[in-house]
Regions:
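Ligand-binding clefts of soluble mixed alpha/beta catalytic domains
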Residues: 57-60, 69-79, 137, 141, ...
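Flexible, low-complexity linker and terminal segments
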Residues: 98-177
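Short acidic, glycine-rich surface-loop motifs adjacent to enzyme active sites
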Residues: 82
Length: 177
């Protein structure tokens, strides 16, 4: 456990940059502190999933009210124009599978993915069917964790706009970020 949401977000981005499938979670006020890191993750093209559980009302929120009032905050997280994906779950079961999809999208497109939930979904208990762990296959995108091809350029201009990535310490993968 980190001392604040800012460091939680930075550690999650660092883990994604280092090759781990990475996610962190917070609620509305905590996400406000994480917004600078959302922009940083996009700038260095680090895959990360940030789960934001909305509470009702402004500031620290109302502890017993549910609403999806943080959607605008997700749209405007950090300054400048940069890519991000925003996904909202509508059930507990869907949240499990969307979490896997969010990790895949983050890695394939090398960007932050913001997964939105709300107080009701975040705090209630529910019996769900046994999860199918093979339903959403793991997709890592253009990722070279071990063997990096000759001529590797981390921020290469490609036809699809997505450059290959590697992890720190991979032979032939040295680059500036």
């Amino acid at each position: 456990q980190m001392e604040d949401e800012i460091n939680v977000a930075n550690f999650a981005v660092g883990a994604g940059y280092a090759g781990a499938r990475s996610a962190c979670a917070t609620s509305g006020g905590g996400f406000a502190l994480m917004t600078e890191v959302v922009g940083f993750a996009s700038m260095i093209e680090a895959p990360v999933v940030m789960i934001e559980v909305a509470r009702g009302g402004p500031s620290t929120g109302l502890p017993t009210k549910t609403e999806q009032g943080d959607l605008n905050q997700l749209y405007g997280a950090s300054q400048g124009d940069f890519p991000r994906a925003i996904i909202a779950q509508s059930s507990i079961e869907e949240g499990f599978y969307l979490g896997q999809e969010a990790l895949n999208i983050a890695e394939e497109y090398q960007m932050p993915v913001l997964l939105s939930s709300d107080l009701y979904l975040g705090e209630h208990f529910e019996t769900v069917p046994l999860y199918d762990f093979d339903k959403v296959p793991i997709e890592r995108g253009k990722f070279y964790p071990d063997k990096v091809p000759d001529g590797f350029l981390r921020y290469e201009l490609t036809k699809d706009g997505i450059s290959p990535r590697t992890i720190p310490g991979a032979k032939g993968g040295r680059h500036d970020a």
